[in-house]
Amino acid sequence: MMDINIQDSFYHTVLHKAIYRKLYDIAEFLLEKGASTELKDLDGYTPLQLVIHEGYTEMVKFNNMEQIIEIKTNRISTR
């Protein structure tokens, strides 16, 4: 079985690449399969930070009101 969170030489995961290419269905599929939202790329972006940085706000969904997103000086965490 392949590691869904494998990173390339730029530390991009498949989820990072799906976001860069605006492949929203694939990104959603990867999240459903357990892709990590915590891994950072070479620039220090997690997938969620990348979504915000690139302005892909259509990808942001609030499925759970208990999740609070904090944006602090290039740091995003969920609790």
UniProtKB/Swiss-Prot annotation:
Placement of ANK repeats on the sequence: 10-39, 43-77
PROSITE patterns, sorted: ANK_REP_REGION, ANK_REPEAT
UniProt name for this protein: Putative ankyrin repeat protein RC0860
Native species: Rickettsia conorii (strain ATCC VR-613 / Malish 7)
Keywords: ANK repeat, Repeat
Disulfide bonds: none
Highest taxon above the source species: Bacteria
Annotated Pfam families: Ank_2
Gene3D superfamilies: Ankyrin repeat-containing domain
